A protein has these predicted regions:
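Outer-membrane beta-barrel transmembrane strand signature
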Residues: 1-53, 94-107, 112-114, 118-123
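Extracytoplasmic gating/loop element in the C-terminal half of outer-membrane beta-barrel translocons
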Residues: 2, 15, 59-140, 146
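A composition-driven signal for long, intrinsically disordered, charge-rich low-complexity tracts
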Residues: 35, 140-141
Length: 147
């Protein structure tokens, strides 16, 4: 950004110019929205009549365009909650919103996807040999650097 708060970009020759002087030839493809790696794993544990299952899921090697920061500015600003839903974009002081790589962030994540804890009771009744009680929680936590 320049001193007035306008975006600066690189033109096709590599020179820094104001965004208003940019042309279609100066645009370039930046980032990759498709993960290079995806994976998941499940761990099962048992002890006596208890059982525990923990499932993880993740992806790595991709980028995300942070639309919230692009349109609304920093999400952490709460000084104007009663008048508007979001603060003015602190990154853009003049001109229009411009899509730049400034708003591209790493999309890598590891998620605790599912945890199930169960207990099996041996009843040894005529029609019911065992009964299992369990509780499950989904989408427990996501480890990521994406804001």
């Amino acid at each position: 950004m320049d001193k007035k708060g306008d975006w600066l970009i690189y033109d096709k020759k590599g020179n820094v110019i104001p965004v208003a002087q940019g042309t279609d030839e100066d645009k370039s493809v930046t980032g990759n929205g498709l993960p290079k790696f995806t994976g998941s794993m499940t761990h099962n544990f048992t002890y006596k009549n208890f059982d525990l299952s923990v499932a993880f899921r993740g992806a790595a090697g991709f980028d995300i365009f942070n639309v919230h920061d692009f349109y609304f500015g920093l999400q952490s600003m709460t000084t104007n909650q009663l008048t508007t839903a979001y603060s003015k974009n602190a990154h853009i002081t003049t001109g229009k919103n411009v899509i730049t790589d400034y708003f591209i962030e790493p999309g890598d994540y590891l998620k605790i996807d599912n945890v199930t804890l169960g207990y099996t009771m041996n009843l040894n009744k005529k029609y019911i040999e065992k009964i299992r009680l369990f509780g499950t929680a989904n989408n427990l936590y996501t480890f990521t650097k994406f804001t």
